[in-house]
Swiss-Prot record:
This is Morphogenesis-related protein MSB1. The gene is MSB1. GO terms for biological process: establishment of cell polarity. The modification Phosphoserine is found at S538, S776, S816. Keywords: Phosphoprotein. Present with 172 molecules/cell in log phase SD medium.
Amino acid sequence: MNDMAKPLPTPPTAEIRKSRSNSPKKAQKTNLSPNKNQNNEKNVPRSNGRTKNEHNSMDDEEFEFFHQFSREKVKGVIHVITAELKEKGPDVEFLMIPFRPEQTNDKLLTLLNQLFPLGNGQPVNEKKQLRIVSKADVWTLFQCLKYIWCRLPNSEIIGWKSYLEFKFREEDKKFPRKSFLEIMPQCLASPNHASIVYDFFDLIISISSNSRVNKMSARKISKMCAIWAFSKQIPNSDIQDYDFESAAMKSFAPNNSIQDGLDQWIPASDAMFHLLLAFLRSFVPQDLESAKLPRTLKSLLFNNQYPPRKSTAYTSETILTIPLVTLKTDVFSRKPWQLLERCNDLLDFSDHDAFEAREDYALLKSLFRKKNTVEGISRKMSQESRRLMKAMSTKHSTFQPGWAPRECIENISHLKECIEVKRLDIDDYFIWTWLSSLSFEQTSEKKKIFGRSIILEFEFDGFKKWVVFQECDITLDYNKKGQLKKKTSAQSPTTEKELPPDDFELEDPPLSKSPTLSQTYKKFQAEVPQQSTVRRDSAPDNQGIYHTVISKNALTKNKHNVNLHSFEHKISKWNPLNNLRKKSGSNSSSSSFEEKSKDAPIREEYHTNKNHKSKKEERVLSQFSTLNPDEYQLPVIETGSSNFKIEIPELMYEHDDDDSDKLKNSQKRATDSAIEELNGMVEEMMINEPDDVKISITEAETFESLTKFDQYKPSNITDDDLQSSHSSAVHSLKLSTNTNDSCADSSKYTADRKLAEPRKISEESKVNDDSSSYYSPNINNLPASRMPSQPTYSNSDSKKAFTNESRLNVLQGAVSPSQQVTPKPYKNAPGDCVSPVQQKYYQNDRRNEMSPASAPVPPSAYSPARSPQFSTNSAGFKQNTINVPVGYNDPAHVLANQPHMTYRDQHNYPSHQQKQRPFQNNIVPPELKSRNQRADASPIPQHMVPVKQGVPNLPSNVPLYQQMERMNPNHQHPVNTYKVTQPPYHNNTTNAYGNSRAGNAHMLDGKWSNNPPQMVPKGVRPNQYPQQHVNRYSPQAQPVVPAEYYNGPPPMRAPPMMSHMVPAQEPIRYTAGANRRSFPQGMQQNAYSVPAQPMGAVNSEFYLPEAPQGNKLHGNINKRQERKKLYDNIRSGNFGI
């Protein structure tokens, strides 16, 4: 033992190591640990930024198997592990994500001891490596690979010098297709280095080739792996950090916050993405037909320009804005739980201005409701977050995850401890990267990349919210801000250097055979120069070439949510003035200050410029504000004046101060000819009739384009909450209320959208009838009091107006925006869900309509629109049916108009989605129970109406559009022959949010606290009662989709019918054609003579079969007269504008 106590210049003997290998903790506590450390410090260069004292303090607290590996020794081990992972890993879900239950310290330590039995980085021979690796599981193998990666020389796999030299040489040679295989080896230090780099990208491509199974795309995992590919040594570092011990200026001190970590990692992620595309291009042949890459990798090549000119970190549609709580202190917390306790004590909710968003205030206040305790916070965490906190807080005997040990700088300025709440933009793979940096096998240097931050997930009534907590050195933060101010004041304000546009065009590269050929692997190593000293004379010149494409202002953590930028840009697409700007060539467009690259086929609807953000956080910008007639008015254009200007209030988005100068300069650069052209276009826009404007946003926007990444999609928003809801993972506080802000305002929002002809919209609706979804309120649910554009009816008045005017909207192709409201076409597939903002506690006025809340809209002749609004029933029942004339009690006619099963037959909806949602409110008068049960018992009544009864009696004075719709063969469908026992497909929402309260399209859990009640007759099972009307009669033709359903509510100035023509209400089996109540081809409308029934009976007689009654001749004559009169008014241009 005395010999062992001496410093050994060589590794210990095999016998000594064998006795120590099985007890690493014991060896650490004895005098062997200093010997090992002295040996390593003697032979291995100290890692950057570490003093000797820092090494000793860390060795006292951290277990380390081996500090640093040489490339020559571990090249073979990395290659063997990579080959095994390529074979077994692609089918494993989330293989590269740390903190998995399958990963344990014991397994990792056992594998490391087997591969490196001497403990000095010298592996066993190749045969033993193959045998050891083949017996290990993939989780431990990848953990072992990460352990070796972060302990390579300079703690990096590739290195900034190699990348910058590759970038310079590739540009010099005009970006050859095989640039990675031909140029990259010349930029690496040795063949061993080339072997490791090749295996690195080979593993990334192999894992991401099966991303549909393992949920890891090439773009995300390549950027995540940047923390191992590049160390902190970023050229031209703007801000010098302070050393924590001596307060001397050092360039490589640990990062002080998660923002500093993003500043370091995002440029590295962009470099990794560049190299990944170069690696893929090297295996793509010229012949497209011979491409054998998976579709995911093909799309990666075809949808990204090469080389990437700008950062792609914030170009994803899944960017999420979350609260960032920062504790600035001079004493760091020992564990994350202690940080939460300190935040709990310091957060002051009386100061509302301290929170940038109302959602942040509500979320944090609900978290820290009880002071001086973290039990409530722990209960609100998700299961994964609790597991992560437990792993980081538990003391492990070997490898310890979590924050690296660190001390604060002495607070010589006596700065007071404080807390602040900001906002942070992240993506899902940002969290993956943060997790990877804190994993068990990482070094202290990697654990310091994102400072002392913790990203936690909380659950609130089914919602899942992310919050970032971190603590910063208050002295370091103060000094860095002072240095930044000095730097910015000393330097003249210069914009970032942009790479000059290249002449080459991005080819759509054909795709390749598998890049895992040993021939290519050997050739890649052979390309490395024989001398280890690679030419580095171009490195100083490269320093000017490399630039961080994420600007400093873009990373000041005050950015708005990128999703809001994208949404505002899409709104500007249909704005006529935005189109005028594009035609005139002016640079004053508020959506972007830079021209979108023409050779970039992706991100057509997205601009990465940060200028969309609003500087006034307290002012809520609404997407509907530009459509509000009170706020948006065209200015008076004086063309004769010399200083002609157009000032449009509330149109330009607000910008930061530094961007306002650019806006002014761009406006000054507009030429006189462009202004004249703009003047002419504005006049032309004012002269043109509204029906000339054929604008559709169905193709520009889908529901997925407005939501966040799948696990944490925000809810639909209200007008008042637009800015914060779209820019945050935290949802509006109004989710549980019964207000209709979003719905009411969306009527204004969609008022100007669709004034196209019905036939043109039919083509778009057929094309766009896919499984995607878009937020659109269930407008039928709105109370009449919340609709400014529509008068409030009582129940009787609504019947008059509806029966008289509901059929006239086909004639009104061009009405004012205040009269015609057309939401976007619904594109929900069966089972798609809507937000609880739309699902209120009141029922639909149209009971079983084909609304996006319940069923998909089949391809039809028109795009869907809103239906007239009616007040709720005063008798205590919610209005569940469409308003129908008196005596219109014949279910046979209703069924003849709307054969639900025929719809399902045509559109092939899967049967497993035809589930009826269980209803909660069984509100049926007791006297009707027996009638409902009898109706169940006899699903096929005896009252059969002849189908072709009224063919010869078609009135000749029926308007042409009705005759065409009746006789149009496109609307004829085969006779329904389905069995009655088949459930109708349109009741397919299990709980309106997915399958059995799961799979919500907006939130991960799919659980909402405000599930809307449904009504079903007592004694009838949920899947049973709609079947009474499925096959009562066999219709010969299918009616067209009602005009008012697609063209919006009828104008309210049309005179109501006479009182004797007002029919009573009767529930209608409503599908896509229920509002019109048109009859199948050849069936004449029969009038009825039964007196009107009270409103209570209307709701009570729910799907009860009745016999046909009489003929409704007077009503038909009067309606035709009213139609003709209104048609004449419209033709003469007198339609209320």
